[in-house]
């Protein structure tokens, strides 16, 4: 990779920091919408991607032209859409109805650990002792926020249920990551680009919501401007713009360095939840973050993965 200039590197780092901020603030925004629109969760999910899709497809057409998936692409695209869009959003929205946004921003950090665990069976990924220790550290951090969250204004049983749904979201997103890696390794140079992939996956995933939206009949409700603004934030900024910035960051500074910015998302999630929702700040969150952060770093310091040979 060609070394970027100092100015380009500074701009890219600023973009990546803004990605972490956009994703972090999405947690309290999601909490506000989930609680205020408790009878319309699928409508919120659908509208979020309805806002994101024009941005993603316009950017795709600008960068790559009119990219249409080939026949052999559709099956993996449907699997990726069902897991990363439909099931993940179900875990996200229903989880945010029940738990604190700051807690959820920490719990979702277990996703890379789920990826590593699934890779043992689905990809030829060997787990060394450091990875096992990392899993234990991350799990301890998650357990700590499950059992000792300072957000006691939410009943304990509700927080447990909500955090469990967020964990479900982290798990199904890990399935998406594994299926995407399998698709990339199997298709080689004949694969869709990452930009085309996320655009088409988002479109297919959005379609999955339609039957549930019809059942909710959101057109019978008067939607206020604040709700539209918050949904637009999730769709345009947190989903579409953040992804585009992240993809640019990967191109400039590489995947490993770009991914390191994701580790600070909980910091923005906790602080923005405190500022916007008046959620509690406590040392438990700091300890949980440190355990998850270093646990994930140890898990990610594993040998490269590859596809298993067919038996």
Which sequence ranges carry the predicted segments?
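Transmembrane alpha-helices of multi-pass small-molecule transport proteins
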Residues: 37-87, 114, 171-179, 198-217, ...
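Hydrophobic transmembrane alpha-helices of multi-pass small-molecule transport proteins
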Residues: 56, 78, 127-149, 263, ...
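Hydrophobic/aromatic residues within transmembrane alpha-helices
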Residues: 33, 44, 48, 95, ...
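Specific transmembrane alpha-helical segments of multi-pass solute transporters/efflux pumps
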Residues: 26-27, 57-108, 144, 235-253
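Juxtamembrane helix-entry segments on the extracytoplasmic side of multipass membrane proteins
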Residues: 8-12, 37-42, 46, 69-75, ...
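Alpha-helical transmembrane segments of compact multi-pass small-molecule transporters, enriched
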Residues: 26, 51-55, 107-121, 136, ...
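Helix-helix packing/entry segments at the starts of transmembrane helices
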Residues: 19, 44-47, 85, 89, ...
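Glycine-/small-residue-enriched transmembrane alpha-helix faces in small-molecule transporters
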Residues: 1-46, 152-185, 207, 272, ...
């Amino acid at each position: 990779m060609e070394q970027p200039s100092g100015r380009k590197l500074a701009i890219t780092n600023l973009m990546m920091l803004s990605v972490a901020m956009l994703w972090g603030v999405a947690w309290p925004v999601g909490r506000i919408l989930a609680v205020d629109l408790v009878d319309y969760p699928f409508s919120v999910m659908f509208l979020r991607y309805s806002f994101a899709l024009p941005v993603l497809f316009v950017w795709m057409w600008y960068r790559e032209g009119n990219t249409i998936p080939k026949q052999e692409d559709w099956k993996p695209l449907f699997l990726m859409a069902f897991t990363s869009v439909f099931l993940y959003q179900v875990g996200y929205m229903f989880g945010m109805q029940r738990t604190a946004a700051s807690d959820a921003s920490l719990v979702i950090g277990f996703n890379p650990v789920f990826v590593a665990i699934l890779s043992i069976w689905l990809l030829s990924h060997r787990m060394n002792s450091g990875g096992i220790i990392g899993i234990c550290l991350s799990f301890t951090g998650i357990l700590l926020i499950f059992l000792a969250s300072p957000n006691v204004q939410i009943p304990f049983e509700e927080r447990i249920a909500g955090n469990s749904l967020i964990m479900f979201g982290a798990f199904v997103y890990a399935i998406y990551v594994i299926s995407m890696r399998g698709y990339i390794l199997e298709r080689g140079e004949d694969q869709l680009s990452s930009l085309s992939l996320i655009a088409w996956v988002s479109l297919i995933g959005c379609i999955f919501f339609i039957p549930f939206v019809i059942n909710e009949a959101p057109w019978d409700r008067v939607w206020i401007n604040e709700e539209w603004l918050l949904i637009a934030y999730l769709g345009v900024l947190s989903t579409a713009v953040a992804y585009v910035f992240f993809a640019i960051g990967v191109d400039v500074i590489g995947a490993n360095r770009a991914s390191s910015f994701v580790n600070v998302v909980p910091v923005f999630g906790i602080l923005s939840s405190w500022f916007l929702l008046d959620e509690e700040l406590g040392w438990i969150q700091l300890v949980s973050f440190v355990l998850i952060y270093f646990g994930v770093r140890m898990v990610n310091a594993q040998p490269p993965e590859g596809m298993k040979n067919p038996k």
